[in-house]
Swiss-Prot record:
The lineage of its organism: Eukaryota, Metazoa, Chordata, Craniata, Vertebrata. The keyword Glycoprotein does not apply. It is found in: Cell membrane. One of its GO terms (molecular function) is guanyl-nucleotide exchange factor activity. This is Rho guanine nucleotide exchange factor 39. GO terms for biological process: positive regulation of cell migration. Promotes cell proliferation. Residues 227-331 form the PH domain. The keyword Membrane applies. InterPro entries: ARHGEF39 (IPR042987), DBL_dom_sf (IPR035899), DH_dom (IPR000219), PH-like_dom_sf (IPR011993), PH_domain (IPR001849). It holds the Pfam family RhoGEF. Its main location: membrane. SUPFAM superfamilies: DBL homology domain (DH-domain) (SSF48065), PH domain-like (SSF50729). Residues 22-197 form the DH domain.
Length: 335
């Protein structure tokens, strides 16, 4: 049996060396980005939060709504950084996980913060002047307050990626392996909760926008609590006569058909009148034509217990998107 050549490395050693290189690279990236993150957190905490508190330019409720738990997040970074600088990744991230709830609170406040910022910049001239002065400081490097406010949520995604990479490239026999694995799991769970909060906020924005487009008494509260999927114009093909354009709003549980108000309507020009609300749990969907990807559009058939809809589009790609979205809505209700 031949012995390995002198200087040759076995596959296990090579794998360990790759892990160690990736671990060192990830650890360096975590440290360098944490320093920059803490610096930017400090800019907002020092030049905005602290000075606004001292000057009283904003009332306490408005200041709290604008910045949320910013100073506590800054403090959590100040606790973490010395551990990273000392190479104690597992211990540092394990302790940092005690502060993850701050990121959930911050995410829940994002839309309120954005609204307060826009309102105060518009109506509070003292605040507007203060913001311009602070943003003009050389320390900000041209960054505006609105650029810095999303930082914690962006950083949480980086924490997740880096913590997972550190855990994956730390050997199971390392004393830090258990700490890093647990930290990566907790950070990933928090990132998922934050993502869910963001999705709900976007959906609420869609619902508010759509509600503003719908007019008439029967439209009030019609879409409250629903999950928005898609909207757009489609042609309704009647049994006799010409196809009629209608605006459709698709939610996870219902399809709303609306008719545009006349352009010369005194009070409701530019809005839509609700014509029907179809339950997706009772829908049977078929693609009549438009399977081939040709240029001539397509036709969808939607059957409900007491009505059948034929929906047409001259844009086959658009119709394919509708078919996919309708299929998702139907399956979500039947599951």
């Amino acid at each position: 049996m031949e012995s390995p050549a002198p200087g040759a490395r076995c596959p296990v050693q090579e794998q360990r060396a790759r892990w160690e290189r990736k671990r060192a690279c990830t650890a360096r990236e975590l440290l360098e980005t944490e320093r920059r993150y803490q610096e930017q957190l400090g800019l907002v905490a020092t030049y905005f939060v602290a000075i606004l508190r001292a000057k009283g330019t904003l009332r306490p409720p408005e200041r709290q709504a604008l910045f949320g738990p910013w100073e506590l997040i800054y403090g959590a970074s100040q606790e973490l950084l010395p551990y990273l600088e000392g190479g104690r990744w597992g211990q540092g991230l394990e302790g940092f996980c005690n502060h993850l709830e701050l990121y959930t609170q911050f995410a829940a406040n994002v839309e309120r913060s954005r609204t307060i910022l826009q309102e105060q910049l518009k109506k509070n001239k003292h605040f507007r002047r203060f913001v311009r002065l602070q943003e003009g400081r050389p320390e900000f490097g041209g960054l505006q307050l609105q650029d810095l406010l999303p930082l914690p949520l962006q950083r949480l995604q980086q924490y997740e990626n880096l913590a997972v990479a550190l855990a994956e490239n730390t050997g199971p026999n390392s004393p830090e392996h258990k700490q890093l694995t647990r930290a990566a799991q907790l950070i990933s769970e928090t990132a998922q909760r934050v993502h869910t909060i963001g999705q709900k906020q976007k959906n609420e924005q869609h619902l508010q926008r759509i509600q503003a487009l719908l007019s008439g008494r029967q439209a009030k509260g019609l879409i409250s609590g629903r999950w928005f999927l898609r909207q757009g114009w489609l042609l309704v093909v009647p049994p006799r006569g010409e196809p009629r354009p209608r605006m459709f709003f698709l939610f996870s549980d219902a399809l709303l058909m609306a008719k545009p108000r006349p352009p010369l309507h005194l009070l409701q020009s530019g809005t839509f009148a609700c014509r029907a609300l179809y339950p997706m749990g009772e829908c049977q969907l078929h693609r009549v034509f438009g399977h081939s990807g040709g240029p001539c559009g397509g036709l969808l058939s939607l059957s409900f217990p007491h009505e059948k809809l034929l929906l047409m589009s001259t844009d086959q790609e658009e119709l394919s998107h509708w078919y996919h979205s309708l299929t998702l809505a139907i399956s979500s209700q039947k599951n």
